[in-house]
A protein has these predicted regions:
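N-terminal "arm"/small-domain region of PLP-dependent enzymes with the aminotransferase-like
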Residues: 1-30, 35, 343
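PLP-dependent aminotransferase class I/II
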Residues: 8-9, 20, 36-43, 47-53, ...
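Phosphate-binding glycine-rich loop
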Residues: 30-77, 91-95, 101, 167
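Structural detector of well-ordered beta-strand residues that form the stable sheet scaffold
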Residues: 54, 79, 100, 152-153, ...
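Short, well-ordered alpha-helices that flank and scaffold nucleotide-derived cofactor binding pockets
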Residues: 64, 68, 90, 117, ...
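PLP-dependent aminotransferase-like
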Residues: 68-156, 163
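Conserved active-site segment immediately N-terminal to the catalytic lysine
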Residues: 154-189, 216-221
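Short beta-strand-to-turn element immediately C-terminal to the catalytic PLP-Schiff-base lysine
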Residues: 178-179, 193-198, 238
């Protein structure tokens, strides 16, 4: 039996519903911004619970522009967690600011207890990550930010559809970034991103800056960039937006089954699930003893698994210039040696889940 990690070939089997909408778009010749983009931005804003949403061509640019909209520049410091994807730290570096890492916690989120110790006079922004579709306690983070008069940018790239009590990730910070990469809960056929804010002035700046700084066809208000989302992608996004909650509920059901079965095994540590927090399970991660050998065993048995990630950000080559070294963040470093990501997507059936659990149990016998 095969248990695939990637599910995109299943998602796009029903091509007719996409082709019908693409045909309308082609007939309209609206290939740059226009009504298709505006429609998706409004629908997404309503779904998340924000006043303004500004689409971009990917989540990385959404992060960069979010930081730039708050004036982050050379000489500033931005605090973030050291166990995220490269784009989180890369966006800070792209603005010329210094990356200040803090450790993760046992749920793989930013360790809130470490944030205040990392704050200096140069700290401009706290950048928490909603890692793997789970969330840190954003209310606590916002209290710290308010205390020190620091801005917050949420990396909610994996947080679409999640909930912190009744609120969505990406609605707490000043400006927040989302991703619609193919392996996200809400995705497009390629890359896509979104920036969300309730600030009218910031939203106006972002709309101009992401489109060369144009006021209209003949006038510029600033030098900007071109990071526009393509209208072709909104066709996929609008269809997926109608289905995203159903997709997430199926992933939650699969994750709950894995939790129930794997928590019995003393060789496996499942992260705490917080009451009244809805996780999207963009990734299903746990700590496994003998992780590397288990990974080989599962792959041999046709179960595709991944590691997110074997080298934390502070130990990556670009971090050497900042002066980080092994031992600086022990929790994240331990997790990098033990974490394994199992398939949990909405197209898995119960037999595949049971097979995966059995093979994990067989390995530890």
């Amino acid at each position: 039996m095969k248990v695939p990690f990637n599910y995109l070939n299943y998602q796009f089997q029903n091509k007719k519903k996409y082709f019908a909408e693409w045909s309308k778009l082609i007939d309209s010749s609206e290939f740059t911004l226009g009504p298709y983009i505006e429609k998706f931005e409004k629908l997404f804003a309503k779904y998340i619970g924000l006043k303004h949403c500004i689409s971009t061509n990917n989540g990385t640019d959404a992060l960069i522009l979010s930081l730039k909209s708050l004036g982050v520049k050379k000489g500033d410091e931005v605090i973030t967690v050291c166990n995220s994807f490269y784009a989180t730290a890369g966006a800070i570096d792209a603005c010329g600011a210094k990356i200040v890492f803090v450790d993760s916690d046992e749920r793989y989120q930013i360790n809130i207890d470490k944030i205040e110790k990392a704050i200096t006079k140069k700290t401009k922004v706290i950048l928490p990550v909603h890692w793997a579709g789970a969330s840190p306690n954003m209310n606590k983070i916002m209290k710290i930010a308010k205390k020190y008069k620091i801005k917050v940018v949420e990396d909610a790239c994996m947080g679409i559809g999640a909930k912190i009590l009744k609120n969505s990730p990406g609605t707490f910070g000043n400006v927040n970034a989302f991703s619609m990469h193919p392996l996200k809960s809400l995705n497009v056929m390629g890359d896509g991103g979104m920036i969300g804010t309730n600030d009218d002035k910031i939203a106006n700046w972002l709309r101009k800056y992401r489109n060369h700084g144009m006021v209209n066809r003949d006038e510029l208000s600033m030098w900007g960039v071109n990071v526009r989302m393509q209208p072709l992608q909104t066709v996929v996004a609008n269809i997926q937006l109608q289905e995203v909650d159903r997709i997430i509920e199926k992933r939650i059901k699969n994750a709950n089954f894995l939790d129930k079965e794997l928590i019995k095994n003393k060789n496996i540590k499942i992260p705490e699930r917080i009451k009244n927090y809805r996780e999207t399970f963009a990734l299903y991660m746990a700590n496994f003893k003998q992780r590397d050998n288990l990974k080989k065993y599962l792959i041999k048995n046709k179960i595709e698994v991944k590691i997110h990630y074997p080298i934390p950000l502070h130990l990556q080559k670009p971090s050497k210039k900042v002066g980080y070294k092994k031992g600086d963040f022990p929790i994240a470093e331990k997790q990098a040696k033990e974490l394994l990501t199992l398939p949990v997507h909405q197209y898995l059936n119960i037999d595949q889940l049971k097979y995966m659990v059995k093979k994990i149990e067989d390995f530890y016998k």
